[in-house]
UniProtKB/Swiss-Prot annotation:
Disulfide bonds: none annotated. It holds the Pfam family Ribosomal_L12. Forms part of the ribosomal stalk which helps the ribosome interact with GTP-bound translation factors. Is thus essential for accurate translation. Gene3D superfamilies: 3.30.1390.10, Single helix bin. This is Large ribosomal subunit protein bL12. Was identified as a high-confidence drug target. GO terms for biological process: translation.
Length: 130
């Protein structure tokens, strides 16, 4: 088997859709028994003062946009999902909306997350930003 260079791997990833990359990451995590999630410090209940929790929330710089439900205007939500998530075809966007709750965007800036949430809610979807 030929060894691929880093540039060749990146070129292959650029050609993949978001769903294909997500499946790849899951299989990679399972194969090598690792996780791509950032480590999170878990404090015991009541151990940290309330002010510390507020400071931690203010320091958060990456947010996930999660589609909770499509609502009554499913077609409009599908159109917005295609607009927000680059590289999605109509079928992939429909599958994503049908499979709610699903993350649409991961580790994006607060402004991008808020903008996506506003567009989705305007289309009739229920969305959370974490």
């Amino acid at each position: 088997m030929a060894k691929l260079s880093t540039d060749e791997l990146l070129d292959a990833f650029k050609e993949m859709t978001l769903l294909e990359l997500s499946d790849f990451v899951k299989k990679f995590e399972e194969t090598f028994e690792v996780t791509a999630a950032a480590p999170v410090a878990v404090a015991a209940a009541g151990a940290a003062p309330a002010g510390a929790a507020v400071e931690a929330a203010e320091e958060q710089s990456e947010f996930d946009v999660i589609l909770e439900a499509a609502g009554d205007k499913k077609i409009g939500v599908i159109k917005v999902v295609r607009e927000i998530v680059s590289g999605l075809g109509l079928k992939e966007a429909k599958d994503l909306v049908d499979g709610a709750p699903k993350p649409l965007l991961e580790k994006v800036a607060k402004e991008a997350a808020d903008e996506a949430k506003a567009k989705l809610e305007a289309a009739g979807a229920t969305v959370t930003v974490k």
